[in-house]
Amino acid sequence: MSIEEQQSPITSTQQGLVLGRQKNGVLMFNGIPYAEPPVGDRRFKRPVSPASWDDIRDATRFGPAAPQLPSGGMTDSVPVSWNEDCLFLNVCTPAIDQKKRPVLVWIHGGAYRSGQGAVPWYNGASFALNGDIVVVSINYRLGALGFTDLSRFGDDYATSGINGICDQIKALEWVRDNISGFGGDPSKVTIAGESA
C-alpha cells in the first residue's frame, strides 16, 4: 500500500466502498452502518442489514451513539452526538491486505443504559499496532429503545425487549461478512466487553 493509500485508505464492504484514515500507525474506519437506521417504522424492531450505497462512504468520523441518560462519566464528554440512528461500528486495522489477522470485537458496557464505541480506550489502535489484530467497536440501542418489551403489540415487536442484544448479533454478522476487506479473518473472531 502506497503512502497516499495509507493516508486515505479505501476498502470494500458488501454495501459499498468506505474511506478511512490513517492515525498513529493504524488505519481507522469509523461510523460504518451495520444495520438500517432503527427509526420511524423500524423503531423497536429487530435490526435489518443496511442498504447499499453507490459512492465512497466517508468513514473518517464516528457515528452517533444511542440516546442515553448522562452517566456522569467520560462517555458524556466524548464529542459524539446521540441519535436514534446509532447502529454504527468502527474498525481499526494495521493494514488492508490478505494476511487474515485475528479479530477482536469489543462491546461496550454501561448497564444497557449508557456507553458507546467511540470512547478513546475502545478504538483499538494499541491492539492493532502492537498485537497485529483487527479491532471492531460497536454502538447498539440502549435503554428504552433497546430493551423495552412491546411484544404485546404484535409479532413486529417480538424482539423489542432484547433489540440491544439483536443489534450486537447483527454487528457480528456484519463482521463475519465484511472483515476480510479490512485484513481480518472471519473465522478468528473473539468477542469481548465489560460491564453490561
Model-derived regions, located:
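Short, solvent-exposed turn/loop segments enriched in Gly/Ser/Thr/Pro and often Arg
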Residues: R141-A144, A192-A196
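A general structural signal for stabilizing positions within well-ordered secondary structure
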Residues: F127, S180-G183
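A ubiquitous, low-specificity "background" feature that marks scattered single residues
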Residues: V91, I96, E173, G184-P186
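Alpha/beta-hydrolase active-site loop
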Residues: C86, A158-G181
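Non-catalytic accessory segments of hydrolases
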Residues: M1-I162
